[in-house]
């Protein structure tokens, strides 16, 4: 039985002249992250008649490390800086004073707090950090963000509330290591704070 099979481009069985092209073509472009910051400044009247200026900055963190909810409490040390540090890496950092360490504290506030309540709480913890030896205190407001999971918390009145989102505040500062435990104790007991966690910042090492 005779059979014919065309297996090569010959004069007997010429193959069509087709240019060699890849079957699939992929293209991917990376878009650099751009931080959209909105600086804010508010002045609050203190009991003694003087004024206290609260500096804060609202940042857009979509697509960064902090996107999608609050991180785990199991890791007490921030791995080589957080997403906020990355977003602000172009900003010159102050030199760490002798005997102090650089820390970040992320606090998630009740989502129903008013702007005045939030500014008052911000002032309270700025003053607490300074009283504990803190320096170069800055606060960054992320706004209301959905939580990665629901959080139940009982307040001092015995009421239990379940939260699905919260106002994220990030405090960056230099302080003595021994002042972190008292700070976390106050944060945990605060009815206005759903969750909080403090991290010591590790500087990146370049070869």
From Swiss-Prot:
Q: Name one GO biological process term.
A: translation
- UniProt keyword Ribosomal protein present: yes
One Pfam match: Ribosomal_S6
Task: State a single Gene Ontology molecular function.
Answer: mRNA binding
Gene3D superfamilies recorded for this chain? 3.30.70.60
State the residue spans of region: Disordered.
Answer: 69-99
Location in the cell reads: Plastid, Chloroplast
Q: Which InterPro entries match?
A: Ribosomal_bS6 (IPR000529), Ribosomal_bS6_sf (IPR035980), Ribosomal_S6_plastid/chlpt (IPR020814), Transl_elong_EF1B/ribsomal_bS6 (IPR014717)
Q: Does the keyword Cell division apply?
A: no
Q: Where is the composition biased (Low complexity)?
A: 77-86
Instruction: Give the primary localization class.
Output: plastid
Q: Which domain of life is it from?
A: Eukaryota
What are the GO cellular component annotations?
A: chloroplast; chloroplast thylakoid membrane; nucleus; ribonucleoprotein complex; ribosome; thylakoid
Q: How does it associate, per the subunit comment?
A: Part of the 30S ribosomal subunit.
Name the chain's protein.
Small ribosomal subunit protein bS6c
The lineage, from the top, is:
Eukaryota, Viridiplantae, Streptophyta, Embryophyta, Tracheophyta
């Amino acid at each position: 039985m005779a059979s014919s099979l065309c297996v090569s481009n010959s004069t007997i069985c010429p193959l069509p002249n087709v240019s060699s092209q890849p079957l699939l073509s992929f293209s991917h472009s990376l878009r650099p992250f751009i931080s959209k910051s909105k600086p804010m400044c508010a002045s609050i009247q203190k009991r003694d008649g003087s004024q206290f200026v609260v500096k804060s900055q609202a940042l857009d963190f979509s697509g960064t490390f902090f996107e999608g909810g609050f991180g785990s409490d199991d890791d007490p040390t921030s791995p080589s800086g957080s997403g906020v540090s990355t977003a602000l890496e172009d900003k010159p950092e102050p030199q760490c004073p002798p005997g102090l360490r650089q820390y970040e504290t992320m606090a998630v506030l009740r989502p129903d707090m008013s702007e005045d309540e939030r500014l008052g709480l911000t002032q309270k913890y700025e003053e607490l950090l300074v009283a504990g030896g803190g320096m170069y205190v800055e606060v960054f407001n992320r706004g209301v963000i959905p939580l990665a999971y629901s959080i139940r918390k009982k307040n001092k009145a015995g009421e239990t509330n379940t939260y699905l989102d919260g106002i994220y505040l990030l405090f960056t500062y230099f302080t003595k290591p021994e002042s972190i435990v008292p700070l976390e104790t106050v944060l945990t007991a605060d009815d206005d704070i759903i969750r909080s966690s403090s991290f010591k910042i590790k500087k990146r090492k370049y070869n």
